A protein has these predicted regions:
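Acidic/His- and Gly-rich active-site-bordering loop/insert found
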Residues: 2, 6-7, 17, 21-135, ...
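A structural signal for isolated positions on well-ordered beta-strands in alpha/beta enzyme cores
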Residues: 106, 167-169, 314
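Metal-dependent amide/peptide-bond hydrolase catalytic core
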Residues: 2-6, 15-30, 37, 54-55, ...
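Glycine/serine-rich anion-binding loops at beta->alpha junctions
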Residues: 115, 131-145, 228
Length: 406
C-alpha cells in the first residue's frame, strides 16, 4: 500500500505477519489474540492522533488533541481533568477509580511533539510496508494509543471495570523541558505504586528503558573589550579567543566511562570581521548517568576562570532533569515485565540510554519506574519517523498485564 488516498479515510492495514511467538500460557495467548484482532483499531487510533498536530509551542493545537483524548479516556470510564497553563497546552489527568483499594499505577506520557504546525502537509500520515509513518507516530502517539487500548482490554476482561486504580497523565511540555508539568508529575508519582512510561521503546527489538541520563543546560558568556582590528589591535581583548580556550577546557571534563558528557552545541559572538569581539556565548548540554556526579560537574563549571584576566566570565544553568538510575525498584519492575513478555512469547530486553524523559523525575523520587513501553520503530523527531504495526498487539498485551500485576 503506497499512500492513503484521502487523509480522513480509514487506514487499510497492510497484511503483515504477527511476531513469531513461542508456546505461551493459555490466558496470555488469549489476551495477545485479543489485541491481534484489534491491530487495525490500534493503528487507526494512532492515525487519528497523528493527524491532530500538537507542537509544544502551539497551545490551541495541543489543547485540541487534549480535548479529544479526554473524551476517549472518559469513554473508558475515567474522570478527566485539566491542569491549566498559560504558555503550553493544558496537562491532562485521568483517574480510574475501582472498588479495589490500593495505590494506583501511573501511566505517563506527553501529547506535545517537536514538529511545527503544518508538517503534515509535507510529511503526511501513511501506512506502507507494515509501518505507520508520520510526525509523532513513534514519539509518542503510538504510546497514547497503547494506553487507550490496553485499558479497553482490561475493562473487557474485568466486566467493564479495571482490576486496580489507574491514573493517566499526559503532559504538554515534555519536548521543551517539562518545567510546568514537573510538579504535577512528581505529585502523582508519590502516591502511585509504580510508574509506566509510554515513551518509545529502544531499537527494533523493542527494549524497555531501565536507565536514562540526567540532563543539564549551561550558558557561558565571555565579556572582552572591543577594538578596531587594524588600528587598535593591542587595545582589544577577544571574547571569542577566550571562549575558545574555555571550550577546550570544558572538553577535558568529559568522562565517558562514568557516563559524563559535555557538548558545546551552540556558539555565537562578534559583530564584524574587523572588530575584536567584545562578547561571545556558548550553550552547553551536560549528561550525567548518576545523580551523585551532578554536584561535582556543576562545581567544576562554576569554577572556570578566565585565561585572559582582562576578560570576564558569566556562567548560568544547572541540571534540570535528574538521571533515571537502575535502582532495585526499577530492576524488579523490569523483571516483572520480562516475565510477562516471556509468557506472551518473546524475550524483553532492557537498555540504558542517553536521552531523558519524565520518567527521570519519578525514578529519582524512588518510585519504581519502567520506561520505553510504547511503540517500536525508528526516526523519532525526523522525517522518517514510523511505528511498526506488527509490534502493536504484543506491546498492548504487555502493558495491560503489567498494569494488572504491579
Amino acid at each position: 500500500m503506497k499512500r492513503a488516498q484521502k487523509k480522513k479515510a480509514q487506514v487499510k492495514i497492510a497484511q503483515v505477519k504477527a511476531p513469531a511467538t513461542k508456546a505461551v500460557p493459555a490466558e496470555s495467548a488469549n489476551r495477545l489474540r485479543f489485541f491481534l484482532d484489534r491491530k487495525d483499531a490500534i493503528t487507526e487510533t494512532i492515525r487519528q492522533l497523528v493527524e491532530i498536530e500538537s507542537p509544544s509551542d502551539n497551545k490551541p493545537a495541543v489543547d485540541r488533541l487534549g480535548a479529544l483524548l479526554a473524551g476517549r479516556f472518559e469513554g473508558l470510564g475515567g474522570h478527566a481533568k485539566f491542569h491549566r497553563t498559560q504558555d503550553f497546552g493544558d496537562h491532562l489527568q485521568v483517574d480510574f477509580a475501582t472498588e479495589r483499594s490500593g495505590k494506583p499505577v501511573l501511566l505517563l506520557g506527553h501529547i506535545d511533539t517537536v514538529y511545527p504546525l503544518g508538517t503534515l502537509a509535507g510529511m503526511p500520515c501513511r501506512v506502507d510496508d507494515g509501518r505507520l509513518w508520520g510526525p509523532g507516530a513513534l514519539d509518542m502517539k503510538s504510546g497514547i494509543a497503547l494506553m487507550l487500548h490496553a485499558l479497553d482490554g482490561l475493562r473487557t476482561w474485568h466486566n467493564d471495570s479495571l482490576p486496580r486504580p489507574v491514573t493517566v497523565l499526559l503532559v504538554s511540555d515534555e519536548e521543551v523541558g517539562s518545567e510546568s508539568s514537573r510538579p504535577i508529575t512528581e505529585s502523582l508519582a508519590r502516591r502511585s505504586a509504580a510508574v509506566l512510561v509510554l515513551e518509545p521503546s529502544y531499537g527494533l527489538k523493542g527494549a524497555v528503558k531501565t536507565a536514562r541520563k540526567g540532563v543539564g543546560e549551561y550558558t557561558i558568556k565571555v565579556m572582552g573589550k572591543a577594538a578596531h582590528s587594524g588600528l587598535d589591535f593591542d587595545e582589544g581583548e577577544s571574547a571569542i579567543v577566550e571562549l575558545a580556550r574555555q571550550i577546550t577546557a570544558i572538553s577535558k571534563l568529559v568522562d565517558v566511562k562514568r557516563g559524563l558528557t559535555l557538548n558545546v552545541g551552540l556558539v555565537s559572538g562578534g559583530t564584524r570581521t574587523n572588530v575584536i569581539p567584545a562578547q561571545a556565548t556558548a550553550s552547553l548540554d551536560v549528561r550525567v548517568a548518576r545523580m551523585k556526579d551532578a554536584p561535582g560537574i556543576d562545581r567544576q563549571l562554576r569554577a572556570l576562570r578566565p585565561f585572559n584576566r582582562k576578560c570576564k566570565l558569566e556562567i548560568k544553568g544547572g541540571i534540570n532533569r535528574p538521571p533515571m538510575e537502575r535502582t532495585a525498584g526499577v530492576a524488579a519492575l523490569y523483571r516483572q515485565a520480562s516475565e510477562i513478555a516471556k509468557h506472551l512469547g518473546w524475550k524483553l530486553e532492557e537498555a540504558s540510554v542517553g536521552g531523558g524523559s519524565d520518567g527521570n523525575f519519578t525514578a529519582n523520587l524512588g518510585i519504581p519506574t519502567l520506561d520505553g513501553l510504547g511503540g517500536v520503530g525508528e526516526g523519532a523527531h525526523a522525517t522518517h519517523e514510523y511505528v511498526t504495526i506488527s509490534e502493536l498487539p504484543r506491546r498492548a498485551a504487555l502493558l495491560a498485564e503489567l498494569i494488572e500485576s504491579v
